[in-house]
From Swiss-Prot:
Keyword Heme recorded: no
One Gene Ontology CC term in the entry: plasma membrane
Covalent lipid sites (N-myristoyl glycine): G2
Tissues in which the UniProt entry reports expression: Expressed in roots and shoots.
GO biological-process terms attached to the record: calcium-mediated signaling
Induction comment: By salt, drought and cold stresses, and abscisic acid (ABA).
Name this protein carries in UniProt: Calcineurin B-like protein 7
Family: Belongs to the calcineurin regulatory subunit family.
Record domain EF-hand: where: 31-66, 67-102, 104-139, 148-183
Family annotation (CDD domains): EFh (cd00051)
Broad class of where this protein is predominantly found: membrane
Record site: Involved in dimerization: S140
Subunit structure: Homodimer.
Length: 213
């Protein structure tokens, strides 16, 4: 993979300078440049406009641009920092930074909280947790009965909802996640230290490869 100069970034689509992105994240300049190659691949898979649309994001994650999944939607929404329906290169790098092994645990916990807080109320409610558990199980090809899913939700609230008000606030979530590190197992991608051309999927062991694009 060849190096990409700042001039090439500007010519491409006024993308942010990799040196600036490296200063703001745990990535090195060379890692940011490698991520740019990956970003180009994904952002030109369908619309070819230098921005990642939801369909392209889903194709990269699930190899299916038409698949509807709450989990994929939530990840896309959290990556779309400007909330304009697309992901630009700066958003791509800053969002992937959450999954870097050297990113502080507190930031990973906060991201996971926002992931489950579907309606953006500042709390995780039972219905939100139930919906997310179903979505994650669906993508993991795990089939559980409704009763089993309810038990997962019940146990989570029993342990996390310390003041028993029927919702989990950020402090309760932080305490719960700290005691249950398995919750964040998908929040660290070791191979982000050694960037490759495979999309670092935190849902499935899949990627976007040359043959498919």
């Amino acid at each position: 993979m060849g190096c990409i100069s700042s001039k090439q970034f500007k010519r491409a689509a006024e993308h942010e300078d990799p040196a600036i992105l490296a200063k703001e994240t745990t990535f090195s300049v060379s890692e940011v440049e490698a991520l740019y190659e990956l970003f180009k691949k994904i952002s030109h898979s369908i619309f070819k406009d230098g921005l990642i649309h939801k369909e392209e994001f889903q194709l990269a994650l699930f190899r299916n641009s038409n698949k509807k999944n709450l989990f994929a939607d939530r990840i896309f929404d959290l990556f779309d920092l400007k909330r304009n329906g697309v992901i630009d290169f700066g958003e791509f790098v800053r969002s992937l930074n959450i999954f870097h092994p050297e990113t502080p645990l507190a930031e990973k916990i906060a991201f996971a909280f926002r992931l489950y807080d579907l309606r953006g109320t500042g709390y995780i409610e039972r219905e939100e947790l139930y919906e997310m558990v179903l979505a994650i199980l669906n993508e993991s090809d795990l089939l559980l009965s409704d009763d089993a899913v309810e038990q997962i939700v019940d146990q989570t609230f029993k342990q996390a909802d310390l003041n028993s008000d029927g919702k989990i606030d950020p402090d309760e979530w932080k305490a719960f996640a700290s005691k249950n590190p398995a919750l964040l197992k998908n929040m660290t991608l070791p191979y982000l230290k050694d960037i490759t051309m495979a999309f670092p999927s935190f849902v499935l062991n899949s990627g976007v490869d040359d043959e498919e694009l």
